[in-house]
C-alpha cells in the first residue's frame, strides 16, 4: 500500500481566526467583527481590505458565540422514516427550501421506522440546539418531547400525528384517498378486492384500511378477512400475502396496495400471473407510468406537505402562539391502466 500523503507539508487543525484577519488587513479586531457581522461604522476601503484578507485566509465565522448571545441557532431538524423512500425526497427538498428562505440550515436523519431510533435522533438534534423540528414519527408516544417543547423548540409532525401530545400536524387525506382507490376498482366491476398495507401500528396504514372498508361497505360489499393483510412491507411478506389472495378458492380480482413499496412487489407478482389482475397503489413512484400496464395510483403531494409543515414551524418560531393546527392535504387518483382492468371471468 502506498501512502500518498507521506511527505506533505499540509497542516490540519489551524483554522484562521479573526485575529489573523485583523493582522493581514492591518485593522483592529472590532473592525473585523463589524465587517463579519454586517454592522455599520466601517469605511468602504477598510471593508474591502478586510474582505480580501478573509478570502485570502479562507476565514469562516465561528457561530458558537453568536448563538450563545442570541439564543437561536438558525437551524432546524428533520427526522424522516427512510431517506431512500421516493416519498420523502420531495418533502425533504421542500422543507429545505423554506428553511433556506428563512436563513436556516436543515439537518436531517432517518429513523428507519424504529421508535427508539426516532427518539435518539430527536434528542440528539435538541442537544445541538436546533430551533425547531419537523418529524415523521415512527413511534406513538412523544411525551419525551414535552420538556423540549416547553423549553421553546417548535415542533411539527408530518404524515402521521404525534402520539399522546398536542402538536401541529400535516397529513395526507389517507382515508379519502383509499376510498377513492377502492371506489374506482368497484366502478370497474370488481367485487373481491384485496388490501395489502403497512404495519397496523402506523397511522397511515390504519387510515387507508379504514378507507378501504368504508368504500366496500358503501357499495354493499362484504370484506373477507383473507382479503386484508397488514404487516411489514418486506417483499417476501407482500409476495406471500398477494399470492394467498390470488390463489384462494374465491380469488380477489383486484389489489389495493397500501404504499409504493407494496405496489412495486405487487407489480412483480402480478407480472407472473396468467390472468390480468387490477391494481391501484397508494403513492406514486418513479416509472409507474412506464411499466405495462401503467400503474393507477393515489398520488400524494409530499412537496406541499413539506412546505406546509415548514411554514407552520417558522410561524411558531416567529412567536405565533395558538392551539395546534391540523392540516390535511388532498390526494389525487391518477388512472393509467392497471386500475381499469375488468375482473377476469370465473
Language model feature labels by segment:
Residues 1-74, 343:
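N-terminal helix-turn-helix DNA-binding module of bacterial transcription factors
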Residues 1-11, 56, 97-102, 150-157, ...:
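Bacterial carbohydrate/catabolite-sensing allosteric modules
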Residues 20, 26, 36, 58, ...:
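Conserved functional loop/turn residues at catalytic and ligand-binding sites
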Residues 24, 29-34, 68-84, 184, ...:
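Short beta-strand segments enriched in small/hydrophobic residues
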Residues 59-124, 128-132, 210-213, 217:
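Amphipathic helical "hinge" segments at domain boundaries
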Residues 65, 119-122, 145, 182, ...:
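Short hydrophobic/charged patches on amphipathic alpha-helices used for structural packing
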Residues 112-115, 136-141, 260-261:
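Short beta->alpha connector loops
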Residues 132-145, 157-166:
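Acidic, Gly/Pro-rich loop/turn segments at junctions of secondary structure
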Amino acid at each position: 500500500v502506498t501512502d500518498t500523503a507521506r511527505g506533505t507539508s499540509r497542516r490540519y487543525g489551524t483554522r484562521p481566526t479573526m485575529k489573523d484577519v485583523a493582522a493581514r488587513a492591518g485593522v483592529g479586531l472590532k473592525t473585523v467583527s463589524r465587517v463579519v457581522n454586517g454592522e455599520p461604522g466601517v469605511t468602504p476601503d477598510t471593508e474591502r481590505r478586510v474582505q480580501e484578507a478573509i478570502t485570502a485566509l479562507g476565514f469562516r465565522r465561528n457561530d458558537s458565540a453568536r448563538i450563545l448571545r442570541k439564543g437561536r441557532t438558525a437551524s432546524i431538524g428533520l427526522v424522516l422514516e427512510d431517506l431512500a423512500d421516493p416519498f420523502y425526497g420531495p418533502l425533504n427538498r421542500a422543507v429545505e427550501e423554506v428553511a433556506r428562505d428563512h436563513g436556516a440550515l436543515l439537518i436531517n436523519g432517518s429513523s428507519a421506522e424504529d421508535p427508539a431510533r426516532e427518539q435518539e435522533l430527536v434528542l440528539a438534534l435538541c442537544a445541538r440546539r436546533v430551533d425547531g423540528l419537523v418529524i415523521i414519527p415512527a413511534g406513538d408516544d412523544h411525551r419525551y418531547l414535552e420538556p423540549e417543547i416547553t423549553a421553546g423548540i417548535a415542533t411539527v409532525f408530518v404524515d402521521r400525528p404525534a402520539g399522546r401530545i398536542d402538536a401541529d400536524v400535516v397529513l395526507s387525506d389517507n382515508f379519502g384517498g383509499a376510498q377513492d382507490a377502492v371506489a374506482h376498482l368497484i366502478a370497474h366491476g370488481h367485487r373481491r378486492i384485496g388490501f395489502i398495507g403497512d404495519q397496523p401500528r402506523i397511522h397511515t396504514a390504519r387510515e387507508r384500511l379504514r378507507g378501504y372498508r368504508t368504500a366496500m361497505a358503501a357499495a354493499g360489499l362484504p370484506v373477507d378477512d383473507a382479503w386484508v393483510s397488514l404487516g411489514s412491507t418486506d417483499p417476501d411478506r407482500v409476495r406471500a400475502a398477494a399470492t394467498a389472495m390470488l390463489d384462494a378458492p374465491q380469488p380477489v380480482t383486484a389489489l389495493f396496495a397500501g404504499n409504493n413499496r407494496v405496489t412495486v412487489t405487487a407489480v412483480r407478482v402480478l407480472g407472473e400471473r396468467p390472468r390480468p389482475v387490477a391494481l391501484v397503489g397508494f403513492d406514486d413512484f418513479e416509472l409507474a407510468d412506464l411499466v405495462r400496464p401503467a400503474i393507477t395510483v393515489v398520488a400524494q403531494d409530499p412537496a406541499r406537505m413539506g412546505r406546509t409543515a415548514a411554514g407552520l414551524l417558522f410561524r411558531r418560531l416567529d412567536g405565533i402562539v395558538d392551539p395546534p393546527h391540523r392540516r390535511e392535504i388532498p390526494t389525487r387518483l391518477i388512472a393509467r391502466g392497471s386500475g381499469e382492468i375488468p375482473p377476469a371471468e370465473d
